[in-house]
């Protein structure tokens, strides 16, 4: 059995400001660095054979903090980048929702049927995420930690559990949230979603 730990990056500067990020590359906030250290402490309790990270700073610095504390190999994989939102990147989410309400509500309800006009195509997005998952399935590692972004990690959950990318935004993961999936052959089981108990001291 393979055990996958999916971790959404710690809080970034654009998260704090409510800005749509996608491929933009904002750094962690001071709170984000604290969250990353709390994640690292949490994973000291678990067996982790390898860490995979998106190359984007908010994910990479989260992963690097964990890797440094665990002494575990960190591998950067381009396929874990966040999906591109085109011309919507760098804009405030709520102002866009107000200006383009129907477009955004349709996209949130079913991004396959109603993609954003300028985003990375769902076909391209699915192809790169599936490519990564095929490598995960064939890997000799049994306990893998994957640090990436909301859209990318939601896609991994959708594809492994078979619920389809039309449910991409029906999943919620907070900054520094942990999700665990077990893989046995072609069967995947969602053990828990968006675990946050390691960050309780921040509330």
Curated annotation (Swiss-Prot):
One of its GO terms (biological process) is L-serine biosynthetic process. Its EC number is 3.1.3.3. Activity is not inhibited by EDTA in vitro, nor enhanced by the addition of Mg(2+). The active site is at 9 (tele-phosphohistidine intermediate), 149. Transmembrane segments: none annotated. Keywords: Amino-acid biosynthesis, Hydrolase, Serine biosynthesis. GO terms for cellular component: cytoplasm. InterPro entries: His_Pase_superF_clade-1 (IPR013078), His_PPase_superfam (IPR029033), PGM_Phosphatase (IPR050275). It catalyses: O-phospho-L-serine + H2O = L-serine + phosphate; O-phospho-D-serine + H2O = D-serine + phosphate. Pathway: Amino-acid biosynthesis; L-serine biosynthesis; L-serine from 3-phospho-D-glycerate: step 3/3. Heterodimer with PspA. The PspB subunit appears to have no or considerably lower PSP activity compared with that of PspA. Part of a complex that catalyzes the dephosphorylation of L-phosphoserine to serine and inorganic phosphate. Is poorly or not active toward D-phosphoserine, DL-phosphothreonine, 3-phosphoglycerate, para-nitrophenylphosphate, and fructose-6-phosphate. Does not display phosphoglycerate mutase activity. This is Putative phosphoserine phosphatase 2.
